[in-house]
Amino acid sequence: MAGHSKFKNIMHRKGAQDKKRSAMFSKLSREITVAAKMGMPDPDMNPRLRAAINAAKAQSMPKDNIARAIDKASKGEGDNYEEVRYEGYGPGGVAIIVEALTDNRNRTATNVRTAFAKNGGNLGASGAVSHGFERLGLIEYPGKVGDEEKVLEAAIEAGAEDVESDMGDGDENPGSHQIWVAVESLHEVARELEKTLGEAEGVKLAWKPSMKTSVDADNAATLLKLIDVLEDDDDVQTVWGNYDIPDDVMETLG
């Protein structure tokens, strides 16, 4: 029955992947709808909507799903979501910021607090950790668009503030480029970069840590579990942290 068992395992993994993909599309749709409701339903006139659509495209979200999310907003349909932010500490003293879109603050707050409490962390008050981060715009490209020098040159020309490149080591880790810009310049810089690097995988507001906290083997697994639990919550859009897990520790985690 080994073959049958293997088939079941494959189907289980596929089911889990499909579920995760569906949840991701749901979050992307929510952001598109909120962005369209807050501004014009035309992405050329609404930078936040344009960024949300780009993020959806980067995750291969079907065009019909994107169109439905915009249409829902333009007709005033769907739930009204509120932007909320939670701050706290994870295992090893790692500072964590959680951004969510919710139609029920009490539900989301309870879920986030429980996630922290059950995974070695604790939820703090508003402003508890954000002072250790800088609010910036973030433009993301895959490593394949060019080497560090090419991307750095394009970023400087476009008006970016900083570039962090990881060129990867093969198909499983193709690398990426993170281009940091001032919040007010985000979409202007993104448009300039499109001329030389093409359309970005992600254009969004982000929290960049001023300093990073190194995480040891004792805390790394619990920290990653906390982040997974938070990201799996339907209301949570993004989780930011100031952690740095060394490569040798990541290897021991498999």
Curated annotation (Swiss-Prot):
Biased amino acid composition, Basic residues: 1-14
Any GO BP annotation: regulation of DNA-templated transcription
GO-annotated molecular function: DNA binding
Short name of any one Pfam family annotated for the protein: Transcrip_reg
InterPro entries: Integrase-like_N (IPR017856), TACO1_YebC-like_2nd/3rd_dom (IPR048300), TACO1_YebC_N (IPR049083), Transcrip_reg_TACO1-like (IPR002876), Transcrip_reg_TACO1-like_dom3 (IPR026564), YebC-like (IPR029072)
Localization of this protein: Cytoplasm
Superkingdom, natural source: Bacteria
Sequence segments annotated as region (Disordered): 1-22
PANTHER family reported in the protein's UniProt record: TRANSCRIPTIONAL REGULATORY PROTEIN YEBC-RELATED, TRANSLATIONAL ACTIVATOR OF CYTOCHROME C OXIDASE 1
Entry's family note: Belongs to the TACO1 family.
Protein name as annotated: Probable transcriptional regulatory protein Saro_0419
